[in-house]
Every structure is written in structure tokens, then in C-alpha cells.
Amino acid sequence: MERFCIQTQTLLSFLLVLLLFISRSFASTKNDDVDGGKRVQIRVGLVLDLGSLKGKIVKNSVSMALSYFYAIHNDYKTRVSVSLRNSHGEPLLALASAVDLLKTEGVEAIIGGNSLLEAKLLGELGEKARVPMISLDSPFSLSLSKYTHLIQATHDSTSEAKGITSFINVFDWNSVALVYEDHDDWRESMQLLVEHFHENGVRVQSKVGFTVSSSEDFVMGRLQQLKDLGTTVFVVHLSEVIATHLFPCARRLGLMGDGFVWILTAKTMNSFHENIDDFTKQAMEGVVGFKSYIPMSIELQNFTLRWRKSLPVEEAELTRLSISGIWAHDIAFALARAAEVIRMPNVTSTLLEEITKTRFNGLSGDFQLNDKKLLSNKFEIINMIGSSERRVGFLNSNGSFSNRRHLSSTHNKLETIIWPGGSAQSPKGTSLIDSDRKKLRVLVTSSNRFPRLMKVETDPVTNELIVEGFCIEVFRASISPFNYEVEYIPWLNGSNYDNLAYALHSQKDKYDAAVGDITITSNRSTYVDFTLPFTEMGLGIVAVKERSMWVFFQPLTPDLWITSAFFFVLTGVIVWLIERAENKEFQGSWPQQIGVVLWFGFSTLVYAHREKLKHNLSRFVVTVWVFAVLILTASYTATLTSMMTVQQIRFNSNEDYVGHLSGSLIANVALTSSSLRAMRSLGLNSAADYAQALLNKTVSFVVDELPYLKVVLGENPTHFFMVKTQSTTNGFGFMFQKGFELVPNVSREISKLRTSEKLNEMEKRWFDNQLPYTTDDTSNPITLYRFRGLFIIIGVSFAFALAVLVILCLRDKWEILVDNLDLSQRLRHFRIHFVRSIHTSPLDDPIGETAVQMAQQNRQ
């Protein structure tokens, strides 16, 4: 019985515990359902190239990050859900996918934009839709800063450029060769590095670009060129795919041995993964690289462990978590935190604003956005040893180096670096053939049409090629600071320099550069690299100097001469009318009065009028006219002075011929301009032809580039003058093969020659040109139209004076005119009064006397 009771109690206790567990489970399930009903879904788009290793890593990283985040924050009311789209590595498809996510899924943010073009397209879309666009590891570009809704997660290219430059300066290397990937992303991100090199005295000796499709033979050929130039320090800025071909080729050419330095940028190092084969790793022995620093932490170790456990067998290649994956993890955390904040009561900020304010300790370290950029400015310096990476130091924020992460030092102390070839001794970084003169194969133009510019001939005795002229002197002065032995090769295929540019481009094994009267054009620049121009830019016109004995008539046009003469006479007439009644100097016989009128009017030209004016009205007329004369004489003097020093060219499209250099594309372009299109042209072949055609008037003037015309002026300084026109050409430059290391150096030397006046001295020596022979066609005759306002003022003033004079006359005789006289008598009386005002004494004028007598008889 007792045993039964015990069993009954045990059963009841078990049932009670079971009932309590069921009730708790039910309550928990009910609460979960309630909570689940309150959770808000925040949709985020993910646009990736799922066919790439990077795309797969980012996808898994974001998914795992969100799962882990909500596992440790189960009480959050929001849930970020991801909508995935595959861009297949196509920027336009990525844009289309982003638009689809916005329309169909209503996403509130999009993660993508792994290339520069994708980032720009998504940035534009973000501006239109006002939705945050998050770009992972897109290259640094100032062009992206204008997008206010674009967030970038990448390394700080400015800090990296300073670090690499400081690293090169620490070892006292003064020149490097840039080996880069010829793609927009890599070219754009390389520009900042090149700028820092120039600012800090690191000379870029050469640039060599490769693409993913570059063959092994092409890679070997370009590396061989670098080796021939004696390059020992290489800065590599390209993707992992190209690196797997580059370093084995470099090793076969002996460029991975003692004395060589290979430096990898952070973008290159960050793209490396564990799937590089052992052969490539062995070839990279001794390479030094900059890599974005990810601090080791418990969280990173745990995430890496979960990462590896979650990978399916078919994705075994994703074993190693990349830096992009770590940044994607932290971005997902930031999105989840920001999504929770914006759903809180009394919060009015947007998702973009909350993301930019979010700060936490993530897998990449201290996560904080600065100006919408997650800029990782912490770098570790890696030394490739065998198949492993060995950290030899850190790049500090001040640009110095240390062998410990938290040690701020200005002494640039690093761990021992094992360089290519296995040596621990720092390479000198000097050219392998600095002690030997390098040979430069130069094509020289040999048409000899303008010997002062370029003259090529063979010595009949020694059979030696003799090269002279202004162009070759500038070239020799520009290349003299560099240790080159120059071999001149005449270009015998005429004056078509487009073909010369193509020959230089296509026959790289034969020629390195070209020198001569070669104009810089956009078409030629597609095949070769040009230096800075060493001549004046633009076209000019040369004509025979005019020696006219009537040059003093040219400042004013005929209509202005006639109008001015008319107003001189009119001034004298009006003053005579006003002064004649009271001023004896304006009285006398008709010939005397006509002489006074003409004398007074024209004497105002030189302010020589001596007649004393008694009437204020005449003084007003003279004052206005003297003001006008002052303007006319000043303008005439200035224009005449200009015309005496500046010659002018008159175009007559119906009669004139214009000369130009035969076969010159530049001259042909000039002849199609609006002012010269209708004129007839004549091709000439040399400076002597130019002079002869101008002197015998076969052509009225010659149009060509300024250097050619300066030769003509130098040979005939007393016969011709030149008018410089618009700078429609780019001047002469030296041509080099694309990417040739001497181009920036020679351009720098040309700039020095110009600023030091040495280039000007060379021009004077070869062209004998002086400033009076070069003028601007700016002195045009003054037209009546330009002075129409002045003459309107004068005309109105004169009309006003005449009106006042008439009113005064009428006022004095008004009673007589209106007193019992009909209209005909009034007019007759007014005529008599006017005659008397001209001839005050009737005895002096019988006509006037008769008129007075007739008037008196009529009144009686």
C-alpha cells in the first residue's frame, strides 16, 4: 500500500512537471508568435558576381553575419533580409539588377559596386532613388565623391601611396617601374600613387600594362624591355589572375634574383587568395607587399571557424576568408544596427544617416565611417617567404614604419626582409647598366624642306650621317642629362608623319623615338607618346610688307573722312550764323565770310581758331565740337601709330592665292576655315619656295605653323611680316614608343629649357627672329558706325543751337511780323531781317538796300 502511494505521488509529480513544461512551452510559443508579428522586415539588395571567388565570399559573409547578429540580438524588433541578384560581372546588368530590386523588392539599401563603373552607376541610381548604395572594395576615385548616397568600404589609397613612397625613400631608391593592369579600376587607383611619386622625387622610369588576355609571350617581351632598360625596382598593381603569369615569367628572365625589388600594392595583396599554385608562390620569393591590416581577435577566430564549418564540399575554395569578406561582415552588422535604430520611436533619421553614425568593434577593427567611407588606413608589410606570408612591420598613420603594431616610431624600424634571391641585404635599387651607356634608336625626318628646323645629310667622305637643325639641338639638350648613346636613323618615306608614328608603334624592335618637325596630333597620340611641345603653338600668316605713301589716310574709312569734313564745315557755318550780327570778325564781303567759315571750322582740328566769340550759343557749339575733335584725333593718332608698326593682311577671295606646305594636314585644316575657304591655294615645298612665291606675287600670303614661318622670317627679315592667328595646333614634339620611360623626363627637361630662356636662345640662333617681324593683325581702320553715337550728339547739339537762334530772331521782331501783315508780307519781312543780320550795313550790299526800301514802301 505504501509502495502504491509512493508510485501515485511520483506519477502525480511527473504529470505536474509535464503540465508545467507544456504550459511554459505554450506560453513561450505564444510570446514568440506575438513578437514575430511585431518584427519589421528591412529588405537589402545584394548585387554580386556569383561566378567569382570574391562574389561567393561576400554572399556567404553577409548571410552568416546577419544570422549571427540576430542570434545574439534576439530581442531586436527588426530583421534585415537579403535579396540576391547575380550581375555576372557586367556593370549594366548590375545596374539593371539594382533597378529590379528597387521596383520589385522595395529594398532600402543595396550592397554591390565592386568595380569603378559599377560604383558610378549605382551611385547615380542612389542619387535618383535616395537609397544607400554600399560599394565593397571599389577603387579609390575622386569622381565617386559627388555621390551623397554612396558608401565605400575600401582601403585608404592616400595612406597607402604615402606608405609605399616612404618605403622607397627609406631604402634610397630614386626610380621605379610601374607594372599595372590595363583596366579602368587599376589605372584609376594607380594615379594617386604616381602623383605621390612625383611629389617626393621618385622617378617613374617606365610603365608597363597587362590585361587578363595578355599572352605569355607578350608578358615576356615587355618584361624583357624593362630588363634591357636596367630596371631593378618594380611596383606591381594588378590582380591575382595576372600575377600568376607575371612572376613565373619574371623568374625565367632572371628578374627575381639578387638586386631586384618587387613591391605589391594593397589592392594587389588584398586580392590574393590561397588558391595560388605553389609554382607562383615560389616565383614570388622575396616580394614585399602592403596589405590592409585586420587585427587578430577572438571574434575573428570564431567567425573563421564557423565559416569553414558552414562551407559545403563544392565550395572548398572559399576556405580562407578574404578582406572583402571581413568588410562585408562589418557592413552587414552596421546595416542591422542602423535598421533597428530607425524603427525606434521618436527617431526621424534615415537609414543612410544611421549607418554613417554607427560605430562598433567589428572583425576589421574599429568600424567607423568617415565622409561615407570605411577607409582602412592600417597596413601591414608582408614579405613572401616560400609559400607563406611573413609580417615584417606596420605602416603608421604618420607614414613611418615599425615592427610592432602599437609602437609609434619615426625610425622606420622593420623586421629583416628577405629579398628576391634570398639575400637579407637591401638592394641598391640602381640600374644594372648605369655604368654602360644605353642605346637610343631615333628616327629623324630627312625631307630637308626646312633645313633650319631639320637637316639630314650624309658625309660623302666618311659616309657618316650628319643631323643638324633647331629640332635636333633641342633634342640633344633634353636628353643630355641621361646616359644614352643615340643612333640616328633617317626616315626616308616622305613627309607623311602619320606613317612615321605608325612605324614607331609597330616596329618597337627597331625604333625607340622620332625627332623632327613633327606636330602633336590626337591621331598620332593613339600610337605613340609625345613629349611637351618645344615650339610655339598655333598657325601664322606671312605676307610681304607694304610700303604705301598714303598710309596716313588708312586709320579712317572713307565715309568717316567725308562725315568729319562735313561737320568741320557745318561747325563754321553755325558759328558764323550766330556771331555774324554782332561780331565784326565774321563780317565782310562774301569771299571774306566764306573764308572765315572754312578757316574757323577746320582750325578747330588743331585748336588754332583765334576769333573771339561773343555769343554763348556759339561757345556752346564750339565746346561740343572741340570735344568731338579731341576724340577723333586721339583715335586717329592711336590707329595710325598701330598701322605704322603693325602690318595688315587684306583678304580678297576672288583674286588672291594662299600658299601652304604641300602635303601638310595642318595647313589643309587651316584652309578650310571660314575666312580662307573660298580662296585658291597653292602648295609649296620649302622656305625658299615661300619667299619666291611671295616676292613675285604668285601668292598673296602663306599659311603654316609658326616654326616654319619663323624660318622664312629669319631668312628674309626685311621683306616679310607675320601675323599670328589662333593657337589651333599643338606645336612640335618628340615621339616615343608608348610607355617609354624617357617621355616624362624629356618633357621635364624641355620645361627647364623654356624657363631658363635657353630654348629662346636656340630659336634666335636658328631663326634670327625678332619681335618686330611677328605682329598681331589687330589694327583695323575706324569706321563711321563705331562713332555714330558721337555724331548723333553733335548733330542734336547743332540743331538745338540753330533752333535757339531762330527763336531769338523771331522774339526780337515778333511785333513787327504780326502787326497788320499778311502771310506773304511776314515771310518777306523775315527775309529782310535775316539779310540785315548777315549784312548789318546796307551800303555793303545793294540787294539788301533794295529790300529795305521795298519794305518801307509797303508799310506806307
Swiss-Prot record:
Record-linked Gene3D superfamilies: 1.10.287.70, 3.40.50.2300, Periplasmic binding protein-like II
Protein name, entry field: Glutamate receptor 1.3
What PANTHER family does the annotation carry?
IONOTROPIC GLUTAMATE RECEPTOR (PTHR18966)
- Gene symbol of the encoding locus: GLR1.3
**Upper classification of the organism:** Eukaryota, Viridiplantae, Streptophyta, Embryophyta, Tracheophyta
Q: Which GO terms describe its cellular component?
A: plasma membrane
The UniProt subunit note reads as follows:
May form heteromers.
One Pfam annotation, family name?
Lig_chan
What subcellular locations does the record give?
Answer: Membrane
Q: Which residues lie on this side of the membrane: Cytoplasmic?
A: 579-587, 609-619, 811-860
Regions of this protein lying in the Extracellular compartment: 28-557, 641-789
In which broad location class does this protein mainly occur, judging by the first location in its UniProt entry?
A: membrane
